[in-house]
Amino acid sequence: MSKTITKGSLTKEQVDFYNLEGFLVLEDFLNDDDLAGVRASMAARVNEIATDLLTAGLITNTFADSPFELRLAHLFEGLDDKAFLKYGRSWRDRLPGYFDLMANPKILDAIESLIGPEIFSNPVYNTRPKVPKVAAGAVPWHQDKSYWPDANANPVITVWVPLVDATLENGCLH
């Protein structure tokens, strides 16, 4: 099978799949260097949450020595739904690492393949930690396009970037 390249970084086959199915999975698309800034921003946010949880008496261990991939899950293990929703449902921090990820040329090139070169990002975005075995804060499949009246004439694409391997065991998009 030939790999016809479209304008942007995706192949014609990938674009056709997206247009037919409405989604596209690009495994190993971003490398550790691409994710370093957003992981650092996320780690700083997790440090703040650990301090808040400890100060509030909701945890006795900040799991400071836990690896990035596990620390947040460890912090949230014993929390009830109310505490989880306060600290883990939706982060709207404006941190440099998040912006760097949104402006990553690989991501923008892939999006260009799907909608063309006129790309803008809505300033309302969420960082939603997906923690294994936590149902609180789950968000069902939906389309954000309805939130923006002017969007009906334009394509809207959501880019989901897991910062750790997304598996059934450790939490994945479903």
Language model regions located:
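Catalytic core of non-heme Fe(II) oxygenases with the double-stranded beta-helix
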Residues: 94, 109-112, 135-174
